[in-house]
Amino acid sequence: ALALRLGADAAVNTTKEDFRKEAMDLTNGRGYDYVFETAGAAPTMYMAFELAANKAHVCFIGTPHVDLTFTPKLWECMNRKEFWLTGSWMSYSAPFPGREWELTAHYFATGQLKYDPELIAEKLPMSRAQEAFMKYKVPGSVKGRILLVNEWAFPDIV
């Protein structure tokens, strides 16, 4: 639903049992020319390989925290598709804040960056940062992101 509100032509719920069929039906069984994996979770990384079309571009943005292993079947899938696999540097630039942060702020300020308030689950003052991080200890307990706000600079936001 969020992807559709932000302008996607179609969206597939990967928690549904038949999501692979639904996803492939959208491309008439061809697969996707561009696949961006942003979670960094092994299941979604494998899913990216499965959903990619022949000669596709697969980009990993998420950072995995477990080893990835490939079954012979998955390896064969990757080999036969001959896709391009690249990684993308996230938002760790130096000197801070870096060009990507400046561009993001510009596009947000000018309305060129589409944004949905549901992306932010909760706003907390910076003084409660430890509490915010603790909420993420239980997988799935936070839907969206927690925005930490510098309360002395933006007292009206928190």
Residue ranges and their predicted role:
Residues 52-70, 84-85:
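ADP-ribose/adenylate-binding Rossmann-like module
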Residues 46-50, 54, 99-158:
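C-terminal hydrophobic helical "lid"/dimerization subdomain
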Residues 20-24, 68-120, 131:
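C-terminal substrate-binding/catalytic core of Rossmann-like NAD(P)-dependent dehydrogenases/reductases
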Residues 1-47:
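Adenosine-nucleotide cofactor-binding segment
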Residues 39-40, 62-63, 89:
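Short glycine-/small-residue-rich Rossmann-like dinucleotide-binding loops
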Residues 1, 68-70, 155-157:
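Short, charged/polar "capping" segments at the starts of alpha-helices
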Residues 14-18, 39-40, 96, 121-128:
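Short beta->alpha linker loops
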Residues 6-7, 54, 81:
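Short, structured coil segments at secondary-structure junctions
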